[in-house]
Amino acid sequence: MFCHLLGDNYEAVIYSTENRFTPSVYSCGNSGCLVLQFADIQSSP
């Protein structure tokens, strides 16, 4: 899905800080890198 929206080169990275997860999608192309950061998701214990 994101491949068609962001381009051929993209990487989904999830950062975990304590109990918080912040999904981010990086799209790197000729013009540089685009970072789409989603709202933080609170994980329940």
Swiss-Prot record:
Taxonomy, superkingdom: Bacteria
Keywords: Plasmid
Annotated protein name in UniProt: Uncharacterized protein PDa0001
Species the sequence originates in: Xylella fastidiosa (strain Temecula1 / ATCC 700964)
